[in-house]
């Protein structure tokens, strides 16, 4: 007989083997050799366990592992791997992969995956869930050295290798040495009331590139970058969502995106967007540069805002050189897109402090002044001490509210537009350009080489250009350029006004064109010189086919000194759009006409009707004439001469062609006899020539 303890162990082994047969067959996918090896190992483990186990009775519970259960069963049998479990596996066979265990087993093997072998079943674990790589704990590195913060990396940097961000970082940093910071495509965000990046020192040379700078909120100048006395290069950056916070005792601030003082800043492929400054007198929603320089290549300055000057950017006593850049959809009270020059509370330096700005291959569009009652300069404000050259660029769809839809120039020096389109801008006065000259500088507006001031709309005066001289000299020169298709109440193309001893010059040189401007309320379709001005229109220019509501379809001069070309020498087709007839001269067009014999013989003005073909009253140009006058380039009354015939024309005879002539012209007498006899339809007849009949052509 067996001992009781041994019997119990034997029964436990039988039970364990039975339960193993009922478990999911997926837990036993190993081949017979592997099964034998594992069973032999378990026999050794079972023997060891049998010697040390204090409790001779083995009972299976849900807490036992597969290893414990199998070991007890093998101890009972005291057999090789060809024992009960092996025979059971041979009998049961390999199940189909479609078979899945039903319900919840009470042994640990019930959680074993279908791909596990018996060896793996000894330590069943859930499959590991793939996880994303951990975010580097270090913020930046220099070479192979890691740093927990960007500030630590800056402290360690010697400038020989760049600092490279390893992840998005929230940290305000200060750079006071020459180095390169590569954001690595990540975002550097501010977390305190300061600029995200402060750069200062003794002219350090700093490069920041390849990433985004955002979240700056500075109660001082510069939300994104605050730069002082440094040489800085910004490359492949987005600077967005930053703010310089003015008001509440902070005073005037500037540069929501970038503030630079006494610094030279270069930007290449940088977007400065949706930055702002607050406080009623704060400037430079996107960028503020003072006493320095700014170079831009392939940049976008867009959707920035300032309550005072320079929604996109402002340069005070600084120089801009911008190429292939866009300044779009910015807002401010003065100079919504770009503001050049002093602000009212800064001392005027006079023309000795001139700054020469250059913008090439760029677009300034969709900028709008915030104050419809007082705002000026939708596209840009060009102020005291500033000269500006624009080349191969566009100023489109800007709104200047009161003055200067595209450009307002206050006491600027020279503004030169070379191959520039100024189109579809709007303002109350000077929808294209509003220029005012004071005692500080002479102002010179130059339109060159195909520049077009076209399709701008002013609700007041100066659809294309408004020229206002308070003192000194203001000049507008156009050569091979166009001021056409503009609309205003009066002076739709160019309007001039002066006060005191100021001088205004308008010089339309060869190739200048003024067509299709429309004064919709009163006078001066192309040019309206309200008072004294010097107007010169050269031969090979073209000033015609403009319209005005009350007088002067093309020109209205009230006290100006003017010289006009022979109308037949103007360029273009010289065809009047209203009747398709040839333009051959200048004609009075409403308002008044000078009459030297009027009244007491000293001369005076007589009212005169608008030009029509029937009432045309020609003006013969005189060099430097100075009479008040309203003119239109047109033609006199037109006539058609035809034969006056009596009787039937003889067979084979053709009368001379009709002639269309203007009043005062000579006509050709037909070379025909007084009468001609002949036969028509077999009947003798006589054709009598009675001369020409004049027929008035009415258009």
Where do the PLM segments sit?
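Glycine-rich repeat segments that build the extracellular carbohydrate-interaction surface of secreted
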Residues: 153-170, 179-186
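Sec-dependent N-terminal signal peptides of Gram-positive bacterial secreted proteins and lipoproteins
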Residues: 8-28
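Short glycine/acidic-rich loop motifs that flank beta-strands on beta-rich extracellular proteins
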Residues: 172-174, 190-195, 217-223, 243-250, ...
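Low-complexity, acidic Ser/Thr/Pro-rich repeat tracts that form intrinsically disordered stalk/linker regions
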Residues: 1-3, 26-145, 152-155, 635
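Right-handed parallel beta-helix
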Residues: 183-186, 205-215, 231-245, 264-278, ...
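Extracellular beta-strand-rich solenoid/capping regions of secreted or surface-exposed proteins
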Residues: 170-180, 188-210, 214-232, 246-263, ...
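Surface-exposed interfaces of beta-sheet-rich extracellular modules
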Residues: 135, 546, 572-621, 667-699
């Amino acid at each position: 007989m067996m001992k009781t303890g041994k019997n119990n162990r034997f029964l436990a082994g039988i039970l364990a083997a039975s339960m193993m047969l009922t478990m999911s067959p997926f837990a036993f996918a190993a081949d017979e050799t592997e099964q034998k090896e594992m069973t032999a190992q378990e026999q050794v483990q079972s023997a060891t366990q049998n010697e040390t186990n204090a409790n001779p009775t083995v009972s299976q519970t849900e807490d036992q592992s597969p290893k414990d259960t199998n070991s007890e069963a093998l101890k009972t049998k005291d057999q090789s791997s060809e024992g009960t479990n092996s025979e059971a596996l041979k009998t049961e066979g390999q199940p189909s992969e479609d078979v899945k265990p039903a319900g919840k087993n009470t042994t640990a093997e019930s959680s074993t995956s279908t791909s596990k072998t018996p060896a793996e079943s000894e330590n069943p674990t859930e499959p590991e869930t793939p996880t994303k790589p951990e975010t580097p704990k270090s913020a930046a590195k220099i070479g192979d050295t890691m740093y927990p913060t960007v500030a630590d990396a800056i402290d360690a940097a010697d400038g020989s290798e760049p600092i490279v961000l390893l992840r998005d970082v929230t940290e305000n940093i200060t750079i006071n040495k020459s180095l390169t910071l590569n954001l690595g495509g990540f975002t550097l965000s501010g977390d305190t009331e300061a600029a995200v990046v402060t750069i200062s020192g003794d002219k350090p040379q700093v490069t920041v590139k390849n990433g985004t700078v955002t979240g700056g909120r500075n109660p001082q100048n510069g939300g994104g970058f605050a730069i002082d006395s440094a040489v800085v290069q910004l490359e492949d950056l987005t600077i967005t969502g930053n703010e310089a916070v003015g008001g509440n005792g902070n005073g005037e601030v500037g540069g929501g995106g970038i503030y630079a003082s006494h610094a030279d800043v270069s930007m290449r492929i940088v977007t400065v967007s949706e930055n702002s400054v607050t406080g009623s007198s704060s400037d430079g929603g996107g960028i503020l540069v003072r006493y320095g320089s700014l170079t831009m290549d392939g940049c976008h300055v867009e959707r920035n805002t300032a309550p005072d000057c320079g929604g996109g950017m402002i340069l005070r006593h600084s120089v801009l050189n911008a190429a292939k850049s866009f300044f779009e959809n910015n807002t401010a009270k003065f100079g919504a897109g770009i503001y050049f020059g002093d602000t009212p509370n800064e001392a005027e330096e006079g023309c000795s402090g001139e700054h020469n700005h250059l913008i090439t291959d760029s677009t300034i569009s969709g900028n709008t002044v915030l104050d419809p009652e007082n705002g000026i300069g939708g596209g840009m404000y060009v102020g005291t001490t500033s000269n500006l050259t624009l080349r191969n660029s566009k100023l489109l769809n800007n709104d200047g509210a009161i003055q200067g839809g595209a450009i307002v120039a206050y006491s600027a020096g020279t503004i030169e537009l070379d191959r520039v389109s100024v189109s579809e801008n709007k303002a109350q006065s000077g929808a294209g350009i509003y220029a005012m000259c004071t005692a500080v500088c002479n102002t010179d507006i130059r339109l060159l080489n195909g520049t077009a001031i076209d399709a701008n709309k002013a609700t007041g005066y100066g659809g294309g250009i408004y020229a206002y001289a308070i003192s000194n000299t203001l000049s507008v020169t156009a050569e091979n350029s166009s001021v056409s298709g503009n609309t205003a109440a009066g002076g739709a193309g160019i309007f001039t006004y002066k006060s005191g001893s100021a001088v205004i010059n308008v010089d339309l040189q060869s190739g200048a064109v003024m067509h299709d401007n429309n004064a919709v309320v009163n006078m001066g379709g192309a040019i309206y010189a309200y008072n004294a001005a010097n107007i010169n229109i050269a031969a090979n220019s073209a000033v015609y086919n403009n319209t005005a509501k009350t007088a002067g379809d093309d020109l209205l001069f009230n006290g100006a000194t003017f010289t006009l070309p022979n109308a037949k020498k103007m360029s273009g087709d010289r065809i009047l759009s209203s009747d398709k007839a040839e333009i051959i001269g200048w004609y009075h067009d409403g308002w008044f006409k000078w009459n030297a014999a009027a009244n007491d013989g000293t001369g005076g003005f007589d009212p005169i009707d608008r030009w029509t073909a029937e009432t045309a009253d020609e003006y013969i140009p005189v060099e430097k004439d100075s009479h008040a006058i309203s003119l239109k380039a047109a033609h006199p009354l037109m006539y058609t001469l035809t034969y006056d015939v009596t009787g039937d024309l003889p067979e084979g005879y053709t009368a001379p062609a009709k002639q269309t002539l203007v009043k005062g012209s000579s006509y050709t007498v037909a070379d025909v006899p007084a009468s001609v006899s002949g036969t028509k339809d077999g009947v003798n007849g006589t054709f009598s020539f009675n001369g020409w009949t004049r027929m008035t052509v009415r258009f």
